[in-house]
Amino acid sequence: MSEVRVRFAPSPTGFLHIGGLRTALYNYLYAKRNNGKFLLRIEDTDRTRYVEGAIENLLEQLKWAGLDPDEGVVLDDEGNVTEVGECGPYIQSDRVKQGLYQKYIDELIEKGYAYYCFCSKERLDQVKAQQKADGLMPKYDGLCRGISIEDAKKRIANGEEYVIRLKLPENKEITFNDAIKGKITFNTNDMDDQVLIKSDGFPTYHFAVVVDDHLMGITHIVRGDEWISSTAKHVYLYQCFGWDVPEFVHLPVVLNKSGKKLSKRNDDVAVKDFRKKGYLPEAIDNYLALVGWSSEDNQEIMSMEELKHKFDFNRVSKSGGVFDTEKLNWINRHYIKEIENEKLASMLKPYLVEDGVISEDYPEYKLIEIASLFKEELDYMAEITEKVEFLFKDYEMDDDAKEFLNYEKLDELMNALKEEIESVDEIEKEFASGVMKKVQKKTGIKGKDLWMTTRAVVTGNVHGPDLDSIMVVLGKQEVLDRINKALNR
């Protein structure tokens, strides 16, 4: 068997969609499972939709997700777009500039598999409108199919605008096998004479993708199932050239919880948005692998190495995979819990600084306490702001906490705690861990009277995270201010 070579071939028309990342991931995992190569090609033949900076952004998101191409378009160490590999250029517009497609379109025309079409947009619109009115499938009516190459070249020399179309045979069945969907057959009577070269000289997706996949030695074409209806045209082009047809793998669509296709209008779909919220790349990879696929042992938490070992297309579902944010949160929460507190603190800091909760010079030891306090509660990093809000906003006691202000030994308890806190320069973890035992020993107060009364005064609530850590985060002066407020009630 020849080396497995797969490619992810996005268009630089905007942000990387979460469904696109899943397609890239499945390509990557299949390549790694089979000791093959994962290529990245940029398909930018539709220049009207090109977005400046989209290539850099796309490569950055893939790099973040750990999906580094073995070949094709990559980012160098300085963040510049470059290429690695022997089959370049890997950006289609650069391939056009080198004239790579010309010999192949000339071959199709010479063999009678393609023809020049001079129909105007206005005429094409009229034909399609009439077909719709007659209840027919809108497609090109073949007016220019009979124009000879000689006549066509004369018209081109006279300055007439043209495109080049694929000349499909009539009533021919084209069958191909899909690794997920099985055998699929289309009849050419239900297909259109696809434009292969546009009036601007650029190849269309349908022509370029076949030429590029062949020249780059792609063995498995792994893409979304929205391309199934176009695949018969691609198979016919392979047959016209006499090339081996690669294996096709059309992935089920990613759906929202309503069963509709994920859309940027109604759903969070941009990878950059998940990244900004603080989802971890290992969680995103783990979860996306499960959107339409399951491992044989039904394991759900899997590292990239485990995914590489277990992934195959025979367990990919035929129906759409539902993107369930709650399950993503559950998986992300698992990975957050695995992070060391010191590292997690540095990861949480940008969110707290950006939201104005803390300053850049906020003490590291307090950040570590915050990480320790809330790591079990976070679905994603950006949630940290609302989780810690009660520690930083203006101090206020809720009604349940106020009940403890009536405790008969409140003054004795608070004065004992105040005395201990005033004896240190700052509340650090070691002090906080032992201070309540000292207060208990000094006052004889224990249990609920000790702990819940102190919590009510220090936090303004009767429930919440570890009291020791809260005192560290609040700091000496803030804790004393809250104690004094209770004493001066």
From Swiss-Prot:
Location within or outside the cell: Cytoplasm
Query: What GO CC annotations are associated with the protein?
Result: cytoplasm
Alphabetized InterPro entries for the sequence: aa-tRNA-synth_I_cd-bd, aa-tRNA-synth_I_codon-bd_sub2, aa-tRNA-synth_I_CS, aa_tRNA-synth_I_cd-bd_sf, Glu-tRNA-ligase_bac/mito, Glu/Gln-tRNA-synth, Glu/Gln-tRNA-synth_Ib_cat-dom, GluQ/Sye
Task: Write the record's keywords in alphabetical order, separated by commas.
Answer: Aminoacyl-tRNA synthetase, ATP-binding, Cytoplasm, Ligase, Nucleotide-binding, Protein biosynthesis
User: What PROSITE patterns does the record point to?
Assistant: AA_TRNA_LIGASE_I
What GO MF terms are annotated? ATP binding; glutamate-tRNA ligase activity; tRNA binding; zinc ion binding
- EC number(s) on file: 6.1.1.17
Q: What does this protein do?
A: Catalyzes the attachment of glutamate to tRNA(Glu) in a two-step reaction: glutamate is first activated by ATP to form Glu-AMP and then transferred to the acceptor end of tRNA(Glu).
- What's the protein here called? Glutamate--tRNA ligase
In its UniProt entry, the species of origin is given as Finegoldia magna (strain ATCC 29328 / DSM 20472 / WAL 2508)
Gene name of this polypeptide:
gltX
